[in-house]
Amino acid sequence: MDTSCVSINQCGFCTYLFNRSIPLAGEGDGAIMFNTMVDSMALGYIFSALYLLFRLQRSYTYLQKSSNNNNGNGNGNGSSNNDIISINSSNGLNRSGVKISQDTLWDKNFGISIDHPRIINSTYFKYTLFVSLWLAFEGLLLLFLPPNSLAYPAFVIIVGTGHIVTDNWVLVFLYGKEDDRFSARRSFYSCTLLYLIICCTTLASFFDDQTMCKKNDCQTFMFQDEYTSLAITVASLVVYTIVLGMTIKRSFLRPTGRIWLLFLMGYNCISSVGALLNILDVDAGYCFLGIAAIIYSFSYGPLLFRTCGNDTNLLRARGEFLPLLTNFQEYTSLFGRESISTSGEGATTALQLSAFYIRFNEFKFGQVIGEGYFGEVRKAVWKGAVVAVKILHRNSFRNTDGNKEENVFLKEVAILSILRHPNVLQFLGVCSETNLNGIVTEYMGGGSLDRLLTDRYFLIKQNPILAWNMAISIARGMFYLHDWKPNPILHRDLSTKNILLDESLTIAKVADFGLSKEQGFEMTSTVGHLCYQAPEVFIGELYTPKADVYSFGLLVWCIITGEQPNQNLQPLKMAHLAAYENYRPPMPQPMDPMWENLGKLIEMCWKKSPEERPSFSFILDFLEANVPISNTYVPPLKCISDNSVSNNFNNNNNTLNNGSTNNLGLLTLSFSTLNLQKQGGGAEEFHYIDG
């Protein structure tokens, strides 16, 4: 559009307003001018860049401060690597009287330096820093490059079309893969290729017109002809609309990702209307283009940060291991400075807990009681006690986020080793050799709840009070986990396969913490058994304690029906119906009178809205207040005879005295089923095969 009308005051209002240049200093061609639209855009980009840099710096400071607060003397001040930190005492000594240095606590054991945390190496941090620098360069270019030079349109096209990368690359961080470097790299390459194509075609189109800028005319920032601009904005609008529609039907983007899509859709919609009006030679076209460009530039930084996360979410590269770093102080205070050490490549051990470490040659192994992709579970005798040893092949822990494979193993060990409750599976020790990692737990003779419901459900039918005992035991264990401080520990895979029973079937314990996490801000991964997943988890929303409550409701339903929640449906179909059609498995008819209150509790637990579900504190109070008065329950015969245990060990040349397990009152349970996180975020079942 010809802008010469500005000088003779024959433009329409919008054209005049957004093409007008206000002289700030000087005269003639050397005067410093302020263009209403372009310079406002430049200031907007600079504002967005400064905002992002400020929030990044604030996040880094927050990380430094929180690290020093956790590891310093409680005063929040930073300390040098040689300073002595206080752990559960004021004199900097642990309970064993061993001084612990900050260097030992963080750098040596976890490879994380307080001065150079992993946040700096995370893809998300690099992306945000890249966008802020790009916006700053674009703003300074528009503000200070002389608009009457031939370099001005070329540089503006090159930098301006870079929004193809900055606008779309962010979407890779919004679909639940966290710091997935492969996905980020792939998306960056795709966006860069598209950027090069559009940038080259735009430059060719501009220079083919042989149009030279006169005075400040190039500062209108309209180097594309109206038809090209309309085509690009309409195409972008259609693509973003399709993607948004796909996220509504199948939520592969986090809810915050839709905010960014709506922002891009709004900008392209207004810009396309402006381009269309310019084609029709309507003055209002410049109003649409100018308003869209200015709002876009000023809101870009704040909205990008709001979409991707807040200060705490910037720690997402370390977020999965924050419980380990927090609880590491407790390990060291209990077992001394040298109790945990991480070895280099090729070393014989990846983790050593001095009080928990057990060598494989200390076991007398019996039969395999569970197996799967990640390894196997074997019954064993250790120091006269029957235990379960989960033997894990080290290469089964490789993951896609670039972290060391030992971290996944370390995570479960860390969670297990700090839990102490009668209704949570007891951790006894850890083994680590060149190619094998092992976790030692108490042996549970009753097997899994899943196997009981499959093979011996008649025991529950004959003794209805058993269902109450199991529900109360599980609720106590889950209340203990959810009441963990400072943040609740979410199980995320609560199912009948992960509830283990004693030989009398009167005590149930929560097991398998391979997928557990301390609650954070971005827990959106879809994990666990599909049949037990809460609707909000299936569609990709935040994982909260109420998701475990939903799983508990289905678990109790399984106890009183003896069936799996999906019944004849495929697990994926069951999860889809529960999420989108509010389907729940039917309650048994008629229901045992002793189970009527359990039925009411089930319906409370599996409500669609997480806010309407009770907490485990309420659940436990409800169960204990409504447990029916019944005749004394007579436990069934032991599931596994002592002689069979001894014979299994004899077959492995490990002779045991018959009846030796009679004296093992401390450890009489079996670790029968396991689910560990496999590559890509799925889970692999360990099927109970012990007779």
From Swiss-Prot:
Gene coding for it: 7tmk1
CDD domains per record: STKc_MAP3K-like
Identification of the protein by name: Seven transmembrane domain-containing tyrosine-protein kinase 1
Alphabetical list of SUPFAM superfamilies matching this protein: Protein kinase-like (PK-like)
PROSITE patterns found in the cross-reference section: PROTEIN_KINASE_ATP, PROTEIN_KINASE_DOM, PROTEIN_KINASE_TYR
Keyword rRNA processing attributed: no
Lineage per the UniProt record: Eukaryota, Amoebozoa, Evosea, Eumycetozoa, Dictyostelia
Residue ranges annotated for the Protein kinase domain, each copy included: 363-634
Positions of disulphide bridges: none
Extracellular compartment residues: 1-33, 145-153, 208-227, 280-284
Major localization listed first in the record, in broad terms: membrane
Any one annotated GO CC term: membrane
Signal sequence coordinates: none
